[in-house]
């Protein structure tokens, strides 16, 4: 099990890996990786609403597309987290960010890592989020939990990570982001 202080120290001492084959588009998005500061820290995830046009019913971090009014990509992640699951932006202690990743939808997604105090009154925006749940941070960061498939998409090979947590299949970009974080802190 990793303690919160060990996680923070490892995260802040390691540079994120260099980005891989980033797209040249201007479609930017951000997600918040909310780590809840409990005695046994947890990582907050959501199950997207079944009525959404894209990625319906999938497990995801709170986040979304950058708005022209956002002052930074961090502001995008914080705004989206507040809209989707009622995380007050002033309650998030931003630790930093991981290397941006290309999404299958053509966005350049920047993962923002932030700490949350325990006991926040979170509730989902039902138009976007069907469920909020937490995964023990030590389990999410265990590299041995991950499996992967190598798939070909648009003529390029992609590694798709996945793992199960209880009844939740965590896969695709979300699992790739967690896997990237796990590699960075090497639990």
Curated annotation (Swiss-Prot):
PROSITE patterns to which the protein is assigned, alphabetical: NUDIX, NUDIX_COA
Keyword Chaperone: no
CDD domains in alphabetical order: NUDIX_CoAse_Nudt7
Limits of the Nudix hydrolase domain: 26-157
GO biological process: nucleoside diphosphate metabolic process
Alphabetic keyword roster: Hydrolase, Magnesium, Manganese, Metal-binding
Binding site for Mg(2+): 80, 84
GO MF, any single term: magnesium ion binding
Disulfide bond annotation, renumbered to this chain: none
Motif Nudix box per record, residues: 64-86
Catalytic class of the enzyme: hydrolase
Family from the record: Belongs to the Nudix hydrolase family. PCD1 subfamily.
Task performed by this protein: Probably mediates the hydrolysis of some nucleoside diphosphate derivatives.
HAMAP family, per the entry: Nudix_NudL
Protein name (Swiss-Prot/TrEMBL): Uncharacterized Nudix hydrolase NudL
Natural source organism: Photorhabdus laumondii subsp. laumondii (strain DSM 15139 / CIP 105565 / TT01) (Photorhabdus luminescens subsp. laumondii)
